[in-house]
């Protein structure tokens, strides 16, 4: 975000010519620096705006559901940011359909701003959640979507078919899960089809 903010400033782009988004969940080690509490959502939004050098975010995602924070608190925090003009729209990422429905019900009951989008993982290897679980929710609430990992962390690009290139994420510490995934029977089965 710092690099992007510097680039936007250097290029002199007018604010009405681009859209920026950010996510909230991860942060520091202290309890007030992570999750979806009201405090962390507001603090993280302000920090993202500072890094991006903008006065507001167009899209702001709850990067993961937070089992330690009531959904109502999260919805209220996002509504606060919308009312303050600091975000235009808010959404979720990797929430269950039940959690999304609950957020909508809370927003409707309390006259708060509901989420407008979900960001699920969606690719040939990860289809069920989007195609079976989310579609009825998206249809009912007219929810938009952006997806993440359309190439399955690079697995579907074909570069891992016969080898594990040393200059890719699969060889990096912390990304072993990608290597396990492309060596799995389910991946091999999809690839062979």
Could you describe each region identified by the protein language model?
Residues 1-19, 55, 83, 165:
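N-terminal binding-site loop/beta-alpha segment at the start of enzyme catalytic domains
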Residues 1-13, 44-50, 134-142:
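Short amphipathic alpha-helices and their capping/turn segments at secondary-structure boundaries
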Residues 14-18, 22, 55-59, 88-89, ...:
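Short acidic capping loops at alpha-helix termini that bridge into adjacent secondary structure
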Residues 1-10, 62-72:
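Glycine-rich, proline-tolerant flexible connector loops at the mouths of alpha/beta enzymes
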Residues 65, 69-193:
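Beta/alpha (TIM)-barrel catalytic core signal, keyed to glycine-rich beta->alpha loops juxtaposed to Asp/Glu
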Residues 27-33:
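A short acidic, helix-capping loop that chelates divalent metal ions and anchors anionic groups
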Residues 34-53, 71-76, 100-105:
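Short, acidic/polar
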Residues 23-25, 150-151:
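Active-site-proximal beta-strand/loop segments in catalytic clefts of secreted hydrolases
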């Amino acid at each position: 975000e710092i690099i992007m903010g510097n680039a936007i400033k250097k290029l002199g782009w007018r604010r009405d010519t681009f859209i920026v988004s950010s996510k909230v969940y991860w942060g520091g080690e202290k309890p007030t620096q992570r999750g979806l509490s009201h405090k962390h959502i507001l603090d993280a939004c302000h920090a993202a705006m500072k890094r991006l050098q903008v006065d507001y975010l167009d899209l702001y995602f709850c990067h993961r559901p937070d089992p330690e924070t009531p959904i109502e608190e999260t919805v209220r925090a996002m509504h606060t940011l919308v009312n303050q003009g600091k975000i235009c729209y808010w959404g979720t990422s990797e929430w269950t359909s039940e959690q999304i429905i609950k957020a909508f019900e809370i927003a409707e009951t309390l006259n708060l701003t509901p989420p407008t989008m979900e960001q699920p993982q969606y690719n040939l290897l990860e289809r069920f959640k989007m195609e079976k679980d989310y579609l009825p929710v998206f249809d009912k609430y007219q929810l938009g979507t952006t997806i993440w990992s359309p190439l399955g962390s690079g697995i579907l690009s074909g570069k891992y078919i016969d080898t594990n290139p040393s200059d890719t994420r699969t060889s990096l510490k912390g990304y072993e899960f990608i290597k396990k995934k492309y060596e799995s029977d389910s991946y091999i089965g999809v690839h062979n089809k």
